Amino acid sequence: MKVLEGSVAAPNAKVAVAIARFNSFINESLLEGAIDALKRIGQVKDENITIVRTPGAYELPLVARRLAESKKFDAIVALGTVIRGGTAHFEYVAGEASSGLGKVAMDAEIPVAFGVLTTENIEQAIERAGTKAGNKGAEAALTALEMVNLIQQIDAA
């Protein structure tokens, strides 16, 4: 029986990190976690990491699509924070960011790791950006690297 499973060490991977500026006080912690994970655990070199800043989470799918179409990257990590408010805006932004990023991954056949927090309140966002609930930016970065390695294994099988 053959079992394929990716590892997180990917020293030659070229990774784009698309990060929303809106809610930057949370997103910068996600970015720090992602970069730390890429470099320390994934062993990705500085010169192989590109950071692209978007106005908000809604814009992440278009930027991810352009990054994927450039064929310069092995994976994309999308980071942002959408916090529920008193209107339906949350559902629109969170839903479009999620489905749009998933579509990019499927259409471009490149790992697009979803590191967009969708929380009920700011406390939940803070917990997921490096406190009680870990750092979801770091988790997304490691997911991206694992998928890069897994896809390479599938292609070689």
From Swiss-Prot:
Gene: ribH
EC number: 2.5.1.78
Name of this protein: 6,7-dimethyl-8-ribityllumazine synthase
GO molecular function terms attached to this record: 6,7-dimethyl-8-ribityllumazine synthase activity
UniProt record similarity statement: Belongs to the DMRL synthase family.
GO cellular component: cytosol; riboflavin synthase complex
Binding residues for 5-amino-6-(D-ribitylamino)uracil: 22, 57-59, 81-83, 114
Pathway: Cofactor biosynthesis; riboflavin biosynthesis; riboflavin from 2-hydroxy-3-oxobutyl phosphate and 5-amino-6-(D-ribitylamino)uracil: step 1/2
Source superkingdom: Bacteria
Active-site residues from the entry: 89
Matching Pfam families: DMRL_synthase (PF00885)
